[in-house]
UniProtKB/Swiss-Prot annotation:
Belongs to the TACO1 family. YeeN subfamily. The keyword Nucleotidyltransferase does not apply. This is Probable transcriptional regulatory protein YeeN. It comes from Escherichia coli O157:H7. The gene is yeeN. It is found in: Cytoplasm. GO terms for biological process: regulation of DNA-templated transcription.
Length: 238
């Protein structure tokens, strides 16, 4: 899964320049998680997980606190999760996951982006069946066999454990992501660079420079939309 990890790193790195967008999107996700349960991360597993991911993305504490305080204060916005699937040039596929307080606005915006940026929006399930929902855990390390033993003893359902550029990269069944994190913490591992649920393509395509330019424009436009939280694709050279 080395190439898949490389693509995840590339996507995360590409987003790092747009810090204000990252902060805003995490703010929405934290608020939504806090509203759906207790605004205390120790009593709300979903909120705790989002906050951990926000810290990995270097979201400042004041942004996190502001979103939680808004939920505590009885903010009346309700956010709904969504998923939109579609196609780019020459076998390229894309999934956009959204979190929105206005579903009609989001549908219209996503459809417009696909139409204007050389893509075609598809029906639900038209693309996602070619992706595997996967837990991904990454931290500094160099002994994947030892880590695999830790996870095996904790009965974590692991798909793969690899070493990539000084990092241990673990792929789990999506339902065992939190269990895997807990097992690693119990073994003394406390700092993670990634703990995410990712949609990983089962196979990838490489696009020509011309098609890649079109596809990159489509991905960028989706990522720039305020309601889009994550974008997944199957293009190896992006």
């Amino acid at each position: 899964m080395g190439r898949k990890w490389a693509n995840i790193v590339a996507k995360k790195t590409a987003k790092d320049g747009a810090t204000s967008k990252i902060y805003a999107k995490f703010g929405v996700e934290i608020y939504a998680a806090a509203k759906q349960g207790e605004p205390d991360p120790e009593l709300n597993t979903s909120l705790k997980f989002v906050i951990e991911r926000a810290k990995q993305a270097q979201v400042p504490k004041h942004v996190i606190d502001k979103a939680i305080d808004k939920a505590k204060g009885g903010g009346d916005e309700t956010f709904v999760q969504g998923r939109y699937e579609g196609f780019g040039p020459n076998g390229s596929m894309i999934i956009a996951e959204t979190l929105t307080s206005n579903v009609n606005r989001t549908i219209a915006n996503v459809r417009t982006i696909f139409n204007k940026k050389g893509g075609n929006i598809g029906a639900a399930g038209s693309v996602s069946y070619m992706f595997d929902n996967t837990g991904v855990i990454v931290f500094k390390g160099s002994d994947p066999d030892h880590i695999f033993e830790i996870l095996l003893e904790a009965e974590v359902d692991v798909r793969d454990v690899t070493e990539e550029e000084g990092n241990i990269v673990i792929y789990t069944e999506p339902t065992d992501l939190h269990k895997g994190i807990a097992a690693l913490k119990a073994a003394g591992i406390s700092e993670f660079s990634t703990t995410e649920l990712e949609m990983i393509a089962q196979s990838e395509v490489e696009l020509s420079p011309e098609d890649l330019e079109i596809f990159e424009g489509l991905v960028d436009a989706l990522e720039d939309d305020d309601d889009v939280q994550k974008v997944y694709h199957n293009v190896a050279n992006l």
